[in-house]
Each structure stands twice: as C-alpha cells, then as structure tokens.
C-alpha cells in the first residue's frame, strides 16, 4: 500500500462531529460525483478506486439522509484492471444536492458558499473530503515532497487554495491537463496539512521520515564536502611532491635554505597530510598553516623557474 493510500485509510476511519461531517460529504460528492438523467430523474454516481472511501461516502449518505443508495463494484478492463467503486443514488438526488449547496436551479455550483468559509471546523472537514476525493501525496522516503488536490473547475480550485492558505500553508495553484491543482512543496507545510485534516498518524510518520531523510542528506553533504577537501589536498600535495622531486633531481634538496628543506622533507614523507598537520611535523615547529603555505609556494616557484630554465636566485 502506498503512503497516500495509508493517509486516506486513516482519514476514512476518523470519527467526525455530526455538524462537520456534511462538509466532508459535500467535497466528496462535488469532486467525485457525476449526474445522469434516467426516467427524467437525476441519478447521482460517486466513483472512487478506494473501497474505504466508497464505504465512507455510503455511511455519510445514510447518516444524513433517509434515502437508499447502492454500492456497486466494477472492474476496469484496461491497464491494471483494478476494481472501482460507485455509490449511486436513484432517488432524492435533487434534494441532497441542494442541501449540500452543489445544485441550484438544476445548475452545478462551481464554488463553495462564502459563509461556509467562516467555520474553521467545516473548512477542515471540507479539505479532508477534497483530499479523499482527488488528493495525492508523494512517499516522503523516495520522492520529492509534494501534495496536491485536483479540481475540475478553476473557481473551486481557487477556493481550495484559499482554504489551505488560511492556515499559512503557502499553497500554490496551477493548471493541469483538463483541470486545476492546488499543491504544497514544503515538507513542513505538508505535515501541517496532514495534521489539519486529521491524519495524525500519517503526519507523525511523515515527520519521522523527514527527520531521518534530512539528517541523511546533511551527513551526505558533510561527507561530500570532506571528500572534496581531501581531493583538493591530494591534488595540491601531488603537485607539491612533483615539484620537490624536480628540485631534488636538478639541484638537490640539500642545497635549499633550511626552512625550505624542512618543509620539502616533511611533504615527501607525509603526502596525505593537510597544511595544518604538516606544520606540526616540522622539526623546528610547529609552523602555522600560512607559514607552511608560504614555504610551499616558494618551492613551487623554484620548480617553475627550473622548468623555464631560469636562474634560481634563492639558492
């Protein structure tokens, strides 16, 4: 089961206050429902691939309306051939859709009533229903952080975005295929949203994974930085050793001033050491990092003069 499925499973098991559960049902029907006309009557079908969500829609309809509904299971004939589930109402559709403020004079309303936004508990329930209907969230272990909710209508998408940003979630919106999405990219905000809609266990799991992942990334950055520094030291050390060997072959290390001799011998004997550590190995030391660097530069200059065939005044 995917992480998103785990989140939705937890949400379908959540007990919601009677006064707020209708807001969740409103979102589920508005975003997953479709209307057809049979015998001059509206028939409402709410479709989902998640059996737990289908059962929740069925229970909520039964909880609020004294109307018989049916739960239909069908099988896709393409691709994965998964089951999908339809909750269908053949009677009372008009009354239910009007009560849920989805239908007005036989027209589908694309937006949520403005007065609805004044009730914090209902907003949270509506967002929970919206996520159950068309939401998705990436697995925090394997993917980039991303949570989104899809809307068919732009006005409705704007409302979803506004609802989420009431809680400082920094939600953004964009057009996607034949509709629109509101999405979150920040790990902290995704965790806040999961908590907001009641997915507490999923939020805690998300946070645990995020902490481990961030720690792993931090360790990797440190290791990469240290590796880069070691590579830099190794490259510089190789160049210094090549130059010292050239000086020894053409002139002789023993012909160098004592300070340069000490550094040359120390570097040849300890090619892997940093400048700081090298300074502590000098017989007359310890020598500061800048002091060692200065002497090695002198040796490099001598080697370059030898390569250029110039006279070496420092000898």
Swiss-Prot record:
The name this protein goes by in its record: Probable cell division protein WhiA
Entry keywords, A to Z: Cell cycle, Cell division, DNA-binding
Coiled-coil intervals, chain numbering: none
Entry's Gene Ontology BP terms: cell division; regulation of sporulation
DNA-binding region: 274-308
Family (UniProt): Belongs to the WhiA family.
Gene Ontology MF, one: DNA binding
Entry-linked InterPro entries: Homing_endonucl, Sporu_reg_WhiA_N_dom, Sporulation_regulator_WhiA, Sporulation_regulator_WhiA_C, WhiA_LAGLIDADG_dom
Keyword Transmembrane: no
Function: Involved in cell division and chromosome segregation.
